[in-house]
């Protein structure tokens, strides 16, 4: 854990030469967290500490929007390395730093084919679902474990609230949430006329990002890529994109011989 890492650094006499970035995974066991673009899957803690951290930064907190992508440029700046202009990463402590929006994406994970994009601002969060022909909680590597196993059973028994059951219901192509009034992202405002101006703003922001990044997912996955996925995941590949395809041949396994070298025999004189 972080405490042991700090202990080891100090024991090595390197604490005053160290800046430590501590952040976490994003809720693998939570239903709408890992691999999804809701706040549960995007919002993680970040702590920056260390003996080499400038004194004026120690003990301070930030509440503005930042991207973990910015850890790269920030660490380069701390090390005195020039940040290339082409790099999307930004120095968190540079003068004038700020992000109006945070963009995120979800594509195929393992054998589960998906395409979701989102843009989050200080108050609103916009999500676009491209593959509305499948439910959010489609077959994935967590389907047979908890909490999905229990949640699915409760859904089949009609024991979930509408919000809890939404992951197995037909998805809206667009979602818009007021993070101040609805931090759990339950009430979708995308079809509410009162929020049309906000919706248009976030739509435009997302479209601009997709264009700037030349989003390749719009073309779908290659047949060879899908076939390779089938080779790796077999019967789990049930999305319609796999229909009519066959797995690529399994690569030949190389036999690795790990024998201990024989000791040289003593030569009798």
Locations of regions flagged by a protein language model:
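Alpha-helical packing segments of well-folded alpha/beta enzyme cores
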Residues: 1-5, 71, 198, 202-206
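Beta-strand elements within well-structured catalytic alpha/beta cores of enzymes
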Residues: 2-5, 9, 19-24, 45-48, ...
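Histidine-centered active-site microenvironments of extracellular/periplasmic hydrolases
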Residues: 8-67, 88, 111, 234-240
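A generic secondary-structure signal for well-formed alpha-helical elements
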Residues: 6-9, 13, 51, 78-83, ...
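Short beta-strand segments enriched in hydrophobic/aromatic residues
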Residues: 50, 130, 222-225
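C-terminal cap/loop subdomain of S1 sulfatases and analogous C-terminal strand-loop tails that border
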Residues: 28, 72, 79-175
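Long, internal low-complexity/basic segments
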Residues: 43, 157-174, 179-269
């Amino acid at each position: 854990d972080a405490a042991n890492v700090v202990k080891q650094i100090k024991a090595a006499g390197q604490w005053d030469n160290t800046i430590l970035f501590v952040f976490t995974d994003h809720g693998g066991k939570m239903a709408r967290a890992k691999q999804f673009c809701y706040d549960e899957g995007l919002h993680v803690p970040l702590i920056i500490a260390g003996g080499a951290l400038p004194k004026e930064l120690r003990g301070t907190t930030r509440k503005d929007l930042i991207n973990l992508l910015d850890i790269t440029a920030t660490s380069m700046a701390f090390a005195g390395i020039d940040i290339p202009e082409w790099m999307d990463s930004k120095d968190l402590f540079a003068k004038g730093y700020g992000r109006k929006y945070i963009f995120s994406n979800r594509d195929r994970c393992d054998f589960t084919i998906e395409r979701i994009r989102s843009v989050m601002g200080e108050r609103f969060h916009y999500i676009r679902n491209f593959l509305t022909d499948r439910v959010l909680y489609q077959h994935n590597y967590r389907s047979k474990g908890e909490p999905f196993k229990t949640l699915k059973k409760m859904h089949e028994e009609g024991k979930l609230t509408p919000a809890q059951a939404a992951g197995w219901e037909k998805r809206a192509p667009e979602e818009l949430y007021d993070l101040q009034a609805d931090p759990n992202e339950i009430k979708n405002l995308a079809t509410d006329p009162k929020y049309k101006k906000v919706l248009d703003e976030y739509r435009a922001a997302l479209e601009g990002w997709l264009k700037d990044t030349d989003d390749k997912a719009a073309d779908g996955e290659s047949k060879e890529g899908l076939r390779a996925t089938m080779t790796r995941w077999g019967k789990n590949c049930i999305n319609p994109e796999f229909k009519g395809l066959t797995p690529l041949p399994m690569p030949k396994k190389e036999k690795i011989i790990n024998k201990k070298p024989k000791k040289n025999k003593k030569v009798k004189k």
